[in-house]
Amino acid sequence: AGIKTNIHYVLGNNSIDEAIERLQHNDFPVGINAVIFLLHKPVGLGCEENVLHINDPRVKKFFEIVDNQKFNFKIGFDSCSIPAVLNLTKNISRESIDTCEGARWSMYITSDMKALPCSFDNQEMRWAYDISNDTIQNAWDSPQFEDFRNHFRTSCAGCKNRMSCMGGCPIRPQIVLCDHIEKTV
């Protein structure tokens, strides 16, 4: 029918072995456009046990395969994966990646009119701004959003990847796949 199909694949402790197997054996459906790997986050129904860790050899193996093997489809990652892409690959063009867009290019608005830099803050609402009687612009310019952006400005001083990574996720620091000594998340 001419429709491009992208598969979104949540990558966690419960799925990384299958992802490695599928990549190694080119076992994704023929004709797909891309596989977009989304890093598991411990929010909503997500659990802490599924969070990947940088020292897990499977994580290194997964990124080595992605970095060195050729596929008949594109591979993409969510912005939460960028610390791992920067730390564990050499052949992925740095110009093709961007880190967390929360409060930089996007915001999330809850059903009860709370503006958040990212939907993953919808449980703790640490950076929430109530727009039920206010504007989206005021939320964007708020101290809460500025505090969130400040993480990206000040994290991981001295790291060579700082400008591309910006320290990773301030909401769920346990998902940041980085082992650099400069890591401050």
Predicted segment positions?
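Flexible mid-to-C-terminal extensions adjoining Fe-S/redox cofactors in radical SAM and related proteins
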Residues: 114-115, 119-185
